[in-house]
Amino acid sequence: MRAPRGEEDPVSVIAYVLIQTEVGKAAQVAAEVAKIQGVVSAEDVTGPYDVIVRAEAGSVDDLGKMVVSRVQLIEGITRTLTCPVVNL
């Protein structure tokens, strides 16, 4: 699932957002997160996290705003962990 991105938005930061949800809410949460601009993919997974999101943003600040003001407000999410990609 991929949300639309404007061509004018440069990508400087890529991150994975690991999401824990209420029981039985993973598919619903993944579908809602996938609608957010900057989200490249949102997949249900098994293990300690229920949904893993790949997101792109123009800066670390923009990424933080996306997670705090958009992702974390979705009903059914109990916890998030944001992991920025680094090139070593």
PLM feature spans:
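A compositional/biophysical signature of low hydrophobicity enriched in polar/charged and small residues
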Residues: M1-L88
